[in-house]
């Protein structure tokens, strides 16, 4: 198992493309959305991926393929709407505020995406994960306690949203954070840890030296291969533990 994880976690050796992957158009409350499903050869669980602030694109598709390579079905959920892929900073900020500013709608979009994912995967248990904005949505959904059969939540350089009190049965959380990230900052992370301790949550935090925000974004100006590789390996171990493999 260790050898397989190391191979899958090595981004340099990774060959993108799931053997069974497809874009999926679906509806939530009469509105069209476009997700992406990547099937594992012999799935041991389902991973729901929440996209970054620019919407679902090839980055999330690649990550979904990587999850499938680890042996888990992956569904990249769309919370912006089909065709809504903002290109400017202003448009991206507006899109994230629209989603995060309406908790009821955000929850409906996430549950609708999960419902669609379950049409494609027979796996019962689910881990929710996301990048940046997607990590924030992931933790916001963890606070609601509304994801049925959730066994874990993982956030890559996401923020820590306010919300209702943490449910007592919240599944384990995995937080991966850049050491020089200012959005969220180390102070924000410390506040989350204090809150998590008070709520009695099960959580793990990894901090990567010298890594800035968006350290996992391939080709981006803040990409750090060391932090990306280490965080992906940690996430792989998290999946193995949460799905009992």
Region annotations inferred by a language model:
Residues 16-18:
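N-terminal signal peptide c-region/cleavage motif recognized by signal peptidases
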Residues 23-121, 217-219:
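Serine-hydrolase catalytic machinery in alpha/beta-hydrolase-like enzymes
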Residues 63, 185-195:
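Short alpha-helix in the alpha/beta-hydrolase fold that links the catalytic acid
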Residues 110-169:
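Primarily recognizes the serine-hydrolase "nucleophile elbow" in alpha/beta-hydrolase
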Residues 168-173, 201-202:
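Short, proline-enriched alpha-helix->beta-strand connector loops that line the catalytic pocket
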Residues 175-177:
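Short beta-strand/loop motif that positions the catalytic acidic residue
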Residues 180-184:
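Acidic catalytic loop of the alpha/beta-hydrolase fold
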Residues 197, 202-245:
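C-terminal catalytic histidine-bearing segment of alpha/beta-hydrolase fold enzymes
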